[in-house]
Amino acid sequence: MDLDLGDDLRLRSLAPGDAALLIEATSAEEAPSLWGAHPAGPYSLAAAQAALAAWDPAAGGQFSLGILRGQRLVGAVGLMPDNPGSIELAYWVRPEERGKGVASRAVAAAPLWAHRELPSRIWLEIEPGNEPSLRLAQRVGYRFERRISQHCRDWACEDAARDSWHDCLIWVHDPGAA
């Protein structure tokens, strides 16, 4: 998959040869980035290669899409199969690229492609206080579905039983909106 998002941005499938892009993109992050089922990065070469291998949709992994400006990875989108006919969409954008429409373009384009290729229900989990993500969801055609108490993990530690959890708002993509 390779889509032109305009403004010198492309959304394309991440491939095994993209390990160096993942390393460079997440190297300045102070905390792991969450565009998949588990926090990702900052990466070593081995960790980036392992992540790309694990994200193989043919093996049941997520569809990982890079948001590139030229040859620089500025963000990513993960389409994670949840149940048959259901896909969670998660996204991450470099801090210096936030607020520039990068996420809006990718989060609007990815479900349109996914609805054509993988007819599914596509949804976002958003922390209730995350105002930028709530505005983005509304702007690009998602509708609020429900609030789930203590559903989303904070990923402060590896052990789920010791980690803290918070409420999540579920927003579902409406292909007829936006």
Q: Model-found features: residue ranges?
A:
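Acyl-donor (CoA/ACP) binding surface of acyl/acetyltransferases
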Residues: 1-30, 66-178
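Short gly/ser-rich anion-binding loops that grip negatively charged ligand groups
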Residues: 38, 42, 61, 68
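A short helix-loop-beta-strand connector motif used in the catalytic cores of GNAT acetyltransferases and
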Residues: 53-66, 75
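Polar/charged alpha-helical tracts
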Residues: 20, 46-54, 58, 176
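Conserved GNAT-fold acetyl-CoA-binding loop/helix
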Residues: 30-54
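Secondary-structure boundary/capping residues
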Residues: 31, 57-61, 123
